[in-house]
């Protein structure tokens, strides 16, 4: 309880779309019909109020079944969002609802801050559009400018030195860059050098045979 008492409590009139960590004390005026989600959860939309006005709050599952009109409740760590054009309170994952009393509270039903407000809906749509445009425009310009030039220049230059290097390093005679048939000459050279060596050395045995 000490942590809750130290947290600042705001009025319903100060709630804005996108607000988080809201701490509000209100009285329950009405409890709406129960609707079920696809996952089997029960959702109740309740109308609550304080001295500054009224607002709708969406309560899920067991908490909604325990709330009764006239209960004074403290909302902790709630948040606000626009649903179907209406400002609505939610408990959130870390939020909590605690009953602190009954009936004895000064409140005002007017103004109803959950009435459909086209201005709030338009502002939310504009914020979403601007954020998407800022995210969508910046990356393609950078990628298009940086990606085209270096890719083509590097690909054209790379294959030129690779072909002569692989052809020259394969055999010792490949250092002559302009010879088209180095493999043929390399394959034919081993036969002639052997008889040349034998012929040069064969002069002595011929003279010996004549003698």
Curated annotation (Swiss-Prot):
Residues making up the signal peptide according to the UniProt record: none
Keywords associated with the record: DNA damage, DNA repair, DNA-binding, Nucleus
Residues in the DNA-binding region annotation: 27-97
BP terms from Gene Ontology: DNA damage response; DNA repair; double-strand break repair via homologous recombination; mitotic G2/M transition checkpoint; response to ionizing radiation
InterPro entries according to UniProt: NA-bd_OB-fold, SOSS-B
Main location group: nucleus
Polar residues compositional bias, start-end: 136-157
One of the record's GO molecular function terms: single-stranded DNA binding
Example of a GO cellular component annotation carried by this entry: SOSS complex
Biased composition (Pro residues): 179-195
Region described as Disordered: 125-211
Localization per record: Nucleus
Described purpose of this protein according to its UniProt entry: Component of the SOSS complex, a multiprotein complex that functions downstream of the MRN complex to promote DNA repair and G2/M checkpoint. In the SOSS complex, acts as a sensor of single-stranded DNA that binds to single-stranded DNA. The SOSS complex associates with DNA lesions and influences diverse endpoints in the cellular DNA damage response including cell-cycle checkpoint activation, recombinational repair and maintenance of genomic stability. Required for efficient homologous recombination-dependent repair of double-strand breaks (DSBs).
Family as reported in the entry's similarity comment: Belongs to the SOSS-B family. SOSS-B2 subfamily.
Oligomeric and partner information: Component of the SOSS complex, composed of soss-b (soss-b1/nabp2 or soss-b2/nabp1), soss-a/ints3 and soss-c/inip. SOSS complexes containing soss-b1/nabp2 are more abundant than complexes containing soss-b2/nabp1.
Protein name: SOSS complex subunit B2
Gene that encodes it: nabp1
């Amino acid at each position: 309880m000490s942590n809750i008492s130290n947290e600042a409590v705001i009025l319903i009139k100060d709630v804005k779309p996108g607000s988080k960590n809201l701490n509000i004390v209100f009285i329950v005026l009405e409890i709406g019909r129960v609707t079920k989600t696809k996952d089997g959860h029960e959702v109740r939309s309740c109308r609550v109020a304080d001295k500054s006005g009224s607002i709708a709050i969406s309560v899920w599952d067991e908490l909604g079944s325990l709330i009764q009109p006239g209960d004074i409740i403290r909302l902790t760590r709630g948040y606000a969002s626009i649903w179907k054009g209406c400002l609505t309170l939610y408990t959130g994952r870390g939020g909590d609802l605690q009953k602190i009393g009954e009936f004895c509270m000064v409140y005002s039903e007017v103004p109803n801050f959950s009435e459909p407000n086209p201005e709030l809906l338009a502002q939310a749509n504009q914020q979403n559009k601007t954020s998407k445009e800022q995210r969508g425009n910046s990356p393609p310009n950078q990628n298009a400018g940086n990606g085209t030039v270096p890719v083509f220049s590097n690909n054209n230059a790379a294959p030129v030195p690779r072909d002569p290097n692989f052809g020259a390093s394969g055999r010792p005679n490949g250092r002559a860059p302009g010879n088209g048939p180095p493999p043929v000459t390399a394959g034919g050279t081993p036969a002639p050098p052997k008889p040349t060596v034998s012929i040069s050395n064969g002069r002595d045995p011929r003279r010996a045979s004549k003698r």
